Amino acid sequence: IRRYYPFAPMLGARVRTDFFWEGYAFKKGTLVLLDLYGTNHHPDLWENPEEFNPDRFKDWKKSPFDFIPQGGGDYDKGHRCAGEWATVKVMQIVMELLAQELEYEVCEQDLTYSMVRIPTYPESGFRMKILNLKPKAMNRYADKHEGHAYK
């Protein structure tokens, strides 16, 4: 999800020291933009980049500059969000809830998105109709909220 719908289409930064990269000169103080969407959908980096395929991350062995949903590089030396782990954990919890604890239907929706809106997300958001809480979720809810009925 973070590759397909990055939080922002790009990130800005200022060059800290003069350098050359692939024939281009970057002067200290210059504002540069990191194209998150373009890098996360680049066909030289991603096989079938327009395909949503979470399995591509199972055994990730590529560079920390290839997958850049929240900046690139290592946390301690690069420009990667130090809170990225929190985003990943929240998404894991939500995906577990959706996959294991709720019965729902995904409503018809508009999955187009704007490259100027932050955060980047489908035009209609994510719409769903909750049909039922599965027993596992009901038991967990009852344990934490004794005395409250949930139907």
Per-region residue spans from a language model:
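Conserved cytochrome P450 K-helix E-x-x-R motif and the immediately C-terminal K′/meander segment
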Residues: 1-24, 68
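A generic secondary-structure signal for well-formed alpha-helical elements
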Residues: 5, 9, 98-106
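Conserved cytochrome P450 K-helix/beta-meander segment immediately N-terminal to the heme-binding cysteine loop
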Residues: 35-62
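Cytochrome P450 heme-thiolate "Cys pocket" and heme-binding signature region
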Residues: 45, 58-101, 110, 114-118
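Long, compositionally biased intrinsically disordered regions
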Residues: 70-71, 102-117, 121-151
